[in-house]
Swiss-Prot record:
Keywords: Chloroplast, Membrane, NAD, NADP, Plastid, Plastoquinone, Quinone, Thylakoid, Translocase, Transmembrane, Transmembrane helix, Transport
Name by which UniProt lists this protein: NAD(P)H-quinone oxidoreductase subunit 5, chloroplastic
One GO cellular component, as annotated: chloroplast thylakoid membrane
Pfam families: Proton_antipo_C, Proton_antipo_M, Proton_antipo_N
Keyword Thylakoid: yes
Enzyme Commission identifier(s): 7.1.1.-
Organism field: Chlorokybus atmophyticus (Soil alga)
Length: 655
């Protein structure tokens, strides 16, 4: 097994190598690379498959009790500063490696069919491999500096993939929005890392944690420095958390994620399941021993997660775009994870990260299958082929997609025995013990989750067939939706099986996941049937209420949705307009910045440019005047000399 650990650096290098080979081919041998397109895709899938085998081997080794492994080399060494790079493997790393590689390889297989007719097919696989390599590098990083490097690479890849169809104005705007929004969080993360280094003199997680503990006890001060106020330490930790707030789309930096749906559907699955948004939760998990020393920081994290969860769930209720509805669902579930971390439920938050990743990957790939099936009917217009109001009874045309999508929906809603039931139930239980007010928010969010997810399912696969108008399913034109091919369905079936089974590793009866991942042993407590039945009963009960309401409104049509919207007009408008957060940013930041930029332009043109232009004009005119002094006549020169001398003498006498 030592061989696997010594060569674990190959896990991110292999997909990175595949990306570089495609990139060089597109630059130097573009026509040949485009001709060999599926071969390059297969090559990338094989490389990622090897990385998956390595990852599974490491996970098995960690399960068998292999101690954490760290390989470091000194990169920069001076008298006062040293920086090491390398990789670190522990139970958390091993789980994340398998998660990222398994979801990524299924997305690649799916993309081979989904993107087959796209002109950027080869470029897409290059971006996809680079994206996966960046996340794998982040997971293996042993310190904050290395994490920050791969953190930025993940952000760059998301920019490229969200704007993959860059000729579309909406996609171009979306990738810029994602990039700028994440700059806010990344800048905070950068300042926080520098602040923690200033206090502790280290970028290593364990060293920072230990030294901060000593700083709080007054037993540690860096040579040449003074004792640090606790408030400053809190500020540094909050700045670090600003990075995960943006990357994991937490309120109020969540606005980029719904617009990220402008990218191809396979990358939406990867962003929302195993890579970009998971990076934020992963960093919070890595920083957990540090954050946990500051109750104010933990409380802030918990409340940010809870607010994000409830706001995103309310917004998701009124979304008609299939992918954007799932995007707000992702934001809400990420809020669950962050809230769990904030209340100290480390293992529950990580377990929900795993179960949600597979469930959400299944739902996004299922939505892509539906969109693919709708394209022959309504064309390639996203406003139609993603609009749930144009769908209905798709189950008759796409039975496999419908079944797998239903399994993903059941899981996300927390219906037993699906995966997310076990993780969500554990989060609710831990939250109830820590802060009952947050439990109420999380419990209501669970009901809303069930309602909007089954609303999606019923609008797409059940309900009325001709909801969008009789022209949608034109039998005479033979333009009915049809089931996707095997390359799309096989990943869906595999993810459906994983979604059904993966939750059993974290059941409260024998929580193998907690025993494996929880190195700090912070949450060990005996299992109690009464507690389990009360917590699970309340969460399943609210989920069933949401399911029933969605069925009555969108499947059986016994309740008029428009009447409810008219009755709850203020709340409906608030939800439909996304709590006006985008409007606030548009007015408060974009318009103000543009106005300031316009004023700066006017100042530059009229004042600064005016002064410079006047200086040039004055110089030219002075030269034009003075050139007549040089007339070649000696008499004129003598006159000037005498006149200047006379002026000088008179001036001297006067003074």
């Amino acid at each position: 097994m030592e061989f696997i650990y010594r060569y674990a650096w190959l896990i991110p290098i292999l997909p990175f190598l595949g990306s570089m080979i495609i990139g060089l081919g597109l630059i130097s041998l573009r026509r040949a690379t485009q001709t060999l397109r599926w071969r390059f895709a297969f090559f990338n899938i094989v490389l990622l498959g090897i990385a998956l085998i390595f990852s599974i081997s490491i996970l098995i080794s960690q399960l068998n009790g292999h101690p954490p492994y760290k390989w470091l080399i000194e990169w920069i060494v001076t008298n006062q500063f040293s920086l090491e790079i390398g990789y670190s493997i522990d139970p958390l790393t091993s789980v994340m490696l398998v998660l990222v590689t398994s979801v990524a390889i299924l997305v690649m297989i799916y993309s081979d069919s989904y993107m087959s007719y796209d002109q950027g097919y080869v470029r897409f696989f290059a971006y996809l491999s680079l994206f996966t390599a960046s996340m794998l590098g982040l997971v293996l990083s042993p310190n904050l500096v290395q994490i920050y490097v791969f953190w930025e690479l993940v952000g760059m890849c998301s920019y490229l993939l969200i704007g993959f169809w860059f000729t579309r104005p909406a996609a171009a705007d979306a990738c810029q929005k994602a990039f700028v929004t994440n700059r806010v969080g990344d800048f905070g993360l950068f300042l926080g890392i520098l602040g923690l280094y200033w206090v502790t003199g280290s970028f290593e997680f364990q060293t920072i944690s230990n030294r901060l503990s000593n700083v709080l006890l007054g037993d540690f001060v860096l040579p040449g420095s003074h004792p640090v106020q606790v408030e400053l330490l809190v500020l540094f930790n909050l700045l670090v958390f600003l990075g995960p707030m943006a990357k994991s789309a937490q309120f109020p930096l969540h606005v980029w994620l719904p617009d990220a749906m402008e990218g191809p559907t396979p990358i939406s699955a990867l962003i929302h399941a195993a890579t970009m948004v998971a990076a934020g939760v992963f960093l919070v998990a890595r920083m957990f021993p540090i954050f946990n020393q500051f109750p104010i920081v933990m409380g802030f994290i918990a409340w940010i997660g809870a607010i994000t969860a409830i706001i995103a769930a309310i917004i998701a209720v009124t979304q008609n775009d299939l992918k954007k509805g799932l995007a707000y669902s992702t934001i809400s579930q990420l809020g669950y994870m962050i809230m769990a971390m904030g209340v100290g439920s480390y293992t529950a938050g990580l377990f929900h990260l795993i179960t949600h990743a597979y469930s959400k990957a299944l739902l996004f790939l299922g939505s892509g299958s539906v969109i693919h099936g709708m394209e022959p009917v309504v064309g390639f217009n996203p406003s139609k082929n993603q609009n749930m109001l144009f769908m209905g009874k798709m189950r008759e045309f796409m039975p496999v997609t419908a079944i797998t999508f239903l399994l993903g929906t059941l899981s996300l809603c927390g219906i037993p025995p699906m995966a997310c039931f076990w993780s969500k139930d554990e989060i609710l239980s831990q939250t109830f013990q820590a802060q009952p007010i947050l439990w109420i928010i999380a419990w209501v969010t669970a009901g809303l989750t069930s309602f909007y997810m089954f609303r999606m399912y019923f609008l797409v696969f059940e309900g009325k067939q001709f909801r969008g108008g009789e022209f949608i399913y034109d039998v005479r034109a033979k333009s009915l939706p049809k089931e996707s091919n095997k390359k799309i369905l096989i990943p869906l079936i595999i993810l459906a099986l994983v979604t059904t089974l993966v939750g059993f590793v974290g059941t409260p009866f024998n929580n193998m996941f907690a025993k494996f991942i929880n190195l700090t042993r912070l949450e060990e407590h005996p299992f109690e049937w009464n507690e389990f039945l009360s917590m699970s009963g309340s969460s399943v009960g609210i989920a069933l209420i949401g399911l029933t309401l969605a069925s009555l409104i969108y499947k059986e049509s016994k309740i008029d949705a428009n009447q409810i919207a008219n009755t709850l007009t203020p709340l409906y408008k608030l939800s439909f307009n996304k709590f006006y957060i985008d409007h606030i940013y548009q007015i408060g930041f974009i318009k103000v910045n543009r106005s300031l930029a316009q004023k700066a332009l006017e100042l530059d043109q009229q004042i600064i440019d005016g002064f410079i232009n006047f200086t040039g004009f004055f110089t030219i005119m002075t030269g034009e005047i003075l050139k007549y002094v040089e007339n070649g006549r000696v008499q004129s020169y003598v006159f000037v000399i005498i006149f200047a001398t006379l002026i000088f003498v008179l001036a001297s006498q006067g003074f």
